[in-house]
């Protein structure tokens, strides 16, 4: 799966400007989400502080100049940070894996919303 993630990230990178903070957040998401889907929440539990730090850095970073949808990206980044912080609190409170599952899915969906918005202004959907 590491190779698949690597190749997928290369395809995404080829389509749009590099955004280091997006890549760093994605790395943690990809390394923790798939194991959680299979019922193993240990990776995200051990890396949630790192994920929160990366989410805040992602929100505070400069959106690449050629991206359109900047307002929508900013709004979604705020949501990502809010959801990551809430997820961290839930993990720290000792919530069951079952209780964490839906929150992690929502966080994953929010990240993919951001990825979908990250297009150069001259790229059009057909």
Label every PLM stretch briefly:
Residues 16-126:
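Mature extracytoplasmic or organellar-lumen-exposed domains after removal of signal/transit peptides
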């Amino acid at each position: 799966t590491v190779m698949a993630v690597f190749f997928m990230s290369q395809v995404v990178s080829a389509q749009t400007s590099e955004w280091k903070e997006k890549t760093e957040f994605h790395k943690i998401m990809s390394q923790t989400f798939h194991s959680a889907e299979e019922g193993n929440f240990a990776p995200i539990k051990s890396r949630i502080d790192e994920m929160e730090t990366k989410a805040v850095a992602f929100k505070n970073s400069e959106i690449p100049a050629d991206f359109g949808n900047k307002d929508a990206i900013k709004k979604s980044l705020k949501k990502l940070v809010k959801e990551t912080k809430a997820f961290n609190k839930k993990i720290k409170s000792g919530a069951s894996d079952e209780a964490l599952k839906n929150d992690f899915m929502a966080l994953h969906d929010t990240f993919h919303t951001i990825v979908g918005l990250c297009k150069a202004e001259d790229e059009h959907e057909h």
